[in-house]
């Protein structure tokens, strides 16, 4: 087997920002952010949604505070309209 081809498998602190719940588990997720949890420093990975806030697992519907990328883009640039058709002149 070749050496040094596998990603580092380490303990990572995941944070569901909507439910404000922390999960400590092992993962290969890469992140530069760190956070202290129960007296130890762990790599920190924020999540928009997890089993703690997903309607399928919680059994309740609630709106998440974060918008998706497409909705955010449309909110910022939706007023521009998009493609416009070229106007025909009477000279044709």
Swiss-Prot record:
InterPro entries in alphabetical order: Ribosomal_bL28/bL31-like_sf, Ribosomal_bL31, Ribosomal_bL31_B, Ribosomal_bL31_sf
GO BP annotations, alphabetical order: translation
Keyword Ribosomal protein: yes
Presence of keyword Ribonucleoprotein: yes
Any Pfam family the entry gives: Ribosomal_L31
Sorted UniProt keywords: Ribonucleoprotein, Ribosomal protein
SUPFAM superfamilies noted in UniProt: L28p-like
Cellular component, GO annotation: ribonucleoprotein complex; ribosome
UniProt GO MF annotations: structural constituent of ribosome
Assembly with partners or alone: Part of the 50S ribosomal subunit.
UniProt similarity note: Belongs to the bacterial ribosomal protein bL31 family. Type B subfamily.
Name the UniProt record assigns to this protein: Large ribosomal subunit protein bL31B
Species of origin: Psychrobacter sp. (strain PRwf-1)
């Amino acid at each position: 087997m070749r050496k040094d081809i596998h990603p580092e498998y380490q303990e990572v602190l995941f944070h569901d920002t909507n439910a404000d719940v922390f999960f400590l588990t092992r993962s290969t997720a890469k992140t530069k952010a760190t956070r202290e949890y129960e007296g130890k420093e762990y790599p920190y990975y924020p999540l928009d949604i997890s089993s703690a806030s997903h309607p399928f697992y919680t059994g309740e519907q609630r709106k998440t505070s974060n918008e998706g990328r497409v909705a955010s883009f449309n909110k910022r640039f939706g007023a521009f309209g998009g493609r416009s058709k070229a106007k025909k002149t009477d000279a044709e």
